[in-house]
Structures are given as structure tokens and as C-alpha cells.
Amino acid sequence: MLDQHAALDRVEALRQSALALVRNGDYEDALAVYDDALALATDEDARELITINKADAMIALERSGPEVHELARVIMRRRNVRHVYLAAYALQYKYRLENDLKRALFYGQLALRTAEEANEPSWRRIVLLELGNVYELDSQVATAIRCFEESLAIGEESSANRDRDLSHAYAIENLGYCKLLEGKIVDGLAYIHEALEMLSDPIGRAEAYVDLCYGYLEAHDYDKARFYGEAALELAKEPRQIRNAHYLLGEASYKAGDTAGATFHFDELAKHYPQFRNLKSLLFAIDLRSMVNFKL
């Protein structure tokens, strides 16, 4: 019995180590640690949770695989309400990244209902943040703002969740971006700077830097736009953040009269889209900001 408990403790320690790597943006290393945990785990609940966590990291890397395919089965089995919530949450994130907003909203609403059934305000707070992101992508900015504001209004904390400060900061950051979309540049920048004071994880800080780059570009403050765009590139590991930073830095450099800088960043962006051979020429000819959704 002692050996069994020791094995469970070891598996959980590995899972926590992988989660810490994910929070730091080290997804590849996290996947390897999740594999180590799965190799040791014999308890079905533990294996299911690790599978969900690994799928989450794979989704962040925009990959698929057996673990990602397992998420729907976790929901169908409904063996553990927390696992149902986490699987639904992961699937809404997957479909949000794929711009399948109908499915993203379906799984987001499922995660929200599960949080309400479990009477877990902190779960509800986090999924409201994600639903706000989906509505934001769907150009339903007013609905997105309501989700973010409702998320911010939830102050309770469950013993199973220790990320209230992080989700609170994310909600403020996303609220700021929505204000930018509404043309309320001063308010939007203020919210994002407020969030930046609370964000400690590289992913969140990189997102805030990208949005500040966008906001200052909208405000025609090209020096600040370039400062925050470069800061985003230093931290960004998610492909979306890297693409957006290069695009915005290219625009800011071009507007500032730095053609060489614009060329560099547009060239870097073009590497992500090899199917579009004339992308750089198009970017020099047309300002695409009004046509680009920076959360995709």
C-alpha cells in the first residue's frame, strides 16, 4: 500500500512539474514529462487527468494526437466532473485556435454548465474568460466585454484552483483589447498596463505586449509600439503571438520610416505562410490591421 501511495505521489509530482513548464511556455519539455507520468500511472483517474493536461499542451502547440482525440470521450464517460470541465475547456480552446467558433462556443458553454453544476465559481470565472475570447473572435465585442466583466466580478476561490490572480489579470488584459477594438484607445491601453502589473507568466506577458504594440500603433506612437512589439518577441513561444508581433512590428517600422526594419519583420512573418508567395509585397502595399484578428 505504501508503494502504491508513493507511486501516486510520484505521478502527481511529475504532473505538477509539467504544469509548471506549461505555465512557463515550455510545452515541448512538458510533453516529455507528461509521457513520463503516463508511463508510471496505473490509476485510471490519474491517467485520464494527465491525458487531458497533455492534450492541453498539444493544443497550445497547434498539434493533434491520441490525447486530443480522447477529450471527447472523457466528456462522454462523465466519470469525473472536474475532468469533464477540463476536457470541455480544452476543446473550446482547440476550436478557438482553429477559428471554428461554433464548436468553441458549444464546448465553452458545456464547460460553463459543468462549472455551475459543480458549484465551482473559480471554474466559472475561468471559462467566462475563454467565452469572452470566443465572442471577441466572433466580433461580438459587447458580449465579450460582458463575459470579461462577469469573470472579474467573481471573487470566490476553490481549493482546487490557485490561479485567481492570473485569470483576473487575463480578464483585465482581454477587456483592454476589446476597448481597443471599440476605438477607446486610452481606456484600452490603461487596462492592459494594469494587467501587465499582475501578469508574471511569459504567455500572458507576451500577449499583453502584443496588444500594447497594437494599441500604440493605433495611437500613432510608433516608438512605443516597437518597444512593446520587441518585448513580445523576446517572450513569445506561441506561434500566433510570434506571427502577430512580427506583423505589428513590420507595420510600426514602416509607419516610422524604417523600411529595413519593416522588411525584416514582414520576411519573418512570410516564413509562417509559405503558400502566399507575395505576402511581403501585399503588406507593404496595404495596411491589413482592420482585417486582422490578433487573437487568431
Where are these regions (language model features)?
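Residue signature of alpha-solenoid helical repeat architecture, marking inter-repeat boundaries
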Residues: L8, D45, R82-Y85, S122, ...
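Amphipathic alpha-helical segments of tetratricopeptide repeats
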Residues: D35-A39, A72-R77, Q109-E116, E149-A160, ...
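Single-residue signature of alpha-solenoid repeat helices
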Residues: A30, E67-V68, A104, A144, ...
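Structural motif corresponding to the intra-repeat A-B loop/turn of tetratricopeptide repeats
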Residues: N24, L61-E62, E98, A118, ...
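TPR-repeat structural position
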Residues: Y27, S64-G65, L101, P121, ...
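Residue register of alpha-helical TPR repeats
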Residues: E12, L49, L86-Y89, I126, ...
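TPR/TPR-like alpha-solenoid signature
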Residues: L8, R15, I52, Y89-Q92, ...
